[in-house]
């Protein structure tokens, strides 16, 4: 019995050495599906560490670059001059040197008293929107201006209607600034020493 035990002990000793030799060779492990699963699992933590580090997040937007990116956007500036007599909307490029479109409330109404109305400002804004869309603009900044100086520093009634119409036009709106000129010195009102005679 000692011989059979010794004989049985010899193959048992040989089998663990073969199993230990197989993982070292590496060729049989690559073919087995069990071995490929840990490799995929090892790759997943590496991929999971990249978003945490922030390296994969900047790579994701370039994949969607053909659709829309900030580089593809064409921005302009909508200058809104609003007084109690009229509303003028002047669309330019970012430099302000090239006029894209211009319209006023007085063009869209027949009576002088309606030139500064919200309806006229909305019509003027819609005309500017159509022209800007035809020229490929995707968004713009808005600069609102009242008379300023020695006149009114509050925009007229058409300013809000014009801004709302521009916002509903489907463009991306950046900044909205009030660029009303304010005097910082002794600017003299017109009318002379005795003032305006009524």
From Swiss-Prot:
<protein>
    <recommendedName>
        <fullName>Small ribosomal subunit protein uS11</fullName>
    </recommendedName>
</protein>
<feature type="region of interest" description="Disordered">
    <location>
        <begin position="1"/>
        <end position="72"/>
    </location>
</feature>
<feature type="compositionally biased region" description="Low complexity">
    <location>
        <begin position="19"/>
        <end position="58"/>
    </location>
</feature>
<dbReference type="InterPro" id="IPR018102">
    <property type="entry name" value="Ribosomal_uS11_CS"/>
</dbReference>
<dbReference type="InterPro" id="IPR019961">
    <property type="entry name" value="Ribosomal_uS11_archaeal"/>
</dbReference>
<feature type="compositionally biased region" description="Basic residues">
    <location>
        <begin position="187"/>
        <end position="198"/>
    </location>
</feature>
<comment type="function">
    <text>Located on the platform of the 30S subunit.</text>
</comment>
<keyword id="KW-0699">rRNA-binding</keyword>
<dbReference type="GO" id="GO:0005840">
    <property type="term" value="C:ribosome"/>
</dbReference>
<dbReference type="GO" id="GO:0019843">
    <property type="term" value="F:rRNA binding"/>
</dbReference>
<comment type="subunit">
    <text>Part of the 30S ribosomal subunit.</text>
</comment>
<dbReference type="GO" id="GO:0003735">
    <property type="term" value="F:structural constituent of ribosome"/>
</dbReference>
<dbReference type="GO" id="GO:1990904">
    <property type="term" value="C:ribonucleoprotein complex"/>
</dbReference>
<keyword id="KW-0694">RNA-binding</keyword>
<feature type="compositionally biased region" description="Low complexity">
    <location>
        <begin position="1"/>
        <end position="11"/>
    </location>
</feature>
<dbReference type="Pfam" id="PF00411">
    <property type="entry name" value="Ribosomal_S11"/>
</dbReference>
<keyword id="KW-0689">Ribosomal protein</keyword>
<dbReference type="InterPro" id="IPR001971">
    <property type="entry name" value="Ribosomal_uS11"/>
</dbReference>
<feature type="region of interest" description="Disordered">
    <location>
        <begin position="178"/>
        <end position="198"/>
    </location>
</feature>
<comment type="similarity">
    <text>Belongs to the universal ribosomal protein uS11 family.</text>
</comment>
<dbReference type="InterPro" id="IPR036967">
    <property type="entry name" value="Ribosomal_uS11_sf"/>
</dbReference>
<keyword id="KW-0687">Ribonucleoprotein</keyword>
<dbReference type="GO" id="GO:0006412">
    <property type="term" value="P:translation"/>
</dbReference>
